[in-house]
Amino acid sequence: MSKDLDNRYYISLNKDKIIFSCLNKENKISFTMSHILKNGLNNLFEDLEKFFIENLIDIEKSLKDFIKKIYIIFDIDNSLSAHLSIKYKLETEKINENKINELLTYIKNQFNKYSNDQKVIHMTVIRVLIDGKEKDLSLIRETADNLILEVKLECLKNQTVHLIKKLCSNYQISIEKILLANHLRHSYLHQTDNIVFSANKFLSGTSNNEVFWTTKKPIKYGFFEKFFNFFN
């Protein structure tokens, strides 16, 4: 029987090592295994494949489970950050979740149009201005003249995302989500030393200003979730 409902499986990739971790339903790391990168990030994907070849069967035996889904945490410095903003004249329209979704989708699509070698991993709403005044979106139900959204996008190269998805698929493993360690550390500063616990907090929806995309029914991610859930 699969234990996917009880466990979350993570692979953290940094310049020194590959770390596999199993986080159980008590939010404790019940299993971990690491692999030293002798050449740093130069042969990262070759080393990850070697890790799977040499260890995957033993890991599954130890866990008494087949690993079908996994979360990948990139703890590397070659991600791209971009700050973007959009100003929208509302005229007689009221600000609502549909309009916010529409504007955030437009920002993401425009970024993809001009940076098509990048994959957006994280999108965060930095600031919302209504008629020049900073507002909390969760409380807005009003008519205004203009709305300004400021967002931060954090990205990886499309090629990097494609390669790791393909590699995992060779072992019948699907990637649930790719995360960036620097983003997690910024979101949960000083709360934990282990990046896996930060990732789990993030996936549980405790980051109120994060924009989430999902292909499934929306999951509640705090009071911002009705504004910031998207469908591919």
Cite the ranges covered by each PLM segment.
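Nucleotide/phosphate-binding catalytic cleft detector across ATP-hydrolyzing
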Residues: 1-17, 25-30, 34-66, 74-232
